[in-house]
Amino acid sequence: MDKPGRASPESRSGAPPDGSRKARRKKKRRKNAPILRLLVKLAVLALFTLLLFTFVVDVHICRGNGMYPFLQDGDVLIAYKLETCQVGDAVVYRRPDTGEKAVSRVVAVNSDTVEITPLGELLVNSFVPDDKVFYATKPLEGSAITYPVSLTGGVFLLDDHRTEGLDSRLFGEVPRSELLGKVVYVFRRRGI
């Protein structure tokens, strides 16, 4: 029997009692396991979020009232990147003249011909489109765009509030590569 205050023969030799080192490691691993699991879950969530916002959706804040009444200044938009935009869709795109993000509505695609008459009438392929816009569509003063415009694979975009909009009447056809996505959801920030 060992006397109090004296080291046992096992501890004098420097070797711990059988299994104590393994037991301490195992206990430490069990103690750290929830933290490691949480870190792995957070890393997976961060990777998923990065992939989602890189390849699937785009978030955009609407600036100005060019798309009024559909969108208002300050609305937060979710745009879906994987869908091909069609006539009538509201889209987020990068403006060819400034590179800024903007929102407008697709009125013509691919090889359509767009004409805006001096009286404020929009014609696509010589027909009046079925859009529910309340504002007259007039050419923008000072624009270098001449009508009719024949598209070469891109899209022609107009804002819903045609008197305030800075759209394809200013910078012409927008290449499809500049389309960032179709607006699929709107969060209204006003009145919150």
Name every feature range the model reports, one short phrase each.
Residues 37-55:
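Hydrophobic membrane-insertion alpha-helices, especially the h-region
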Residues 2-33, 55, 61, 69-192:
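Soluble "head" domains of membrane/secretory-pathway proteins
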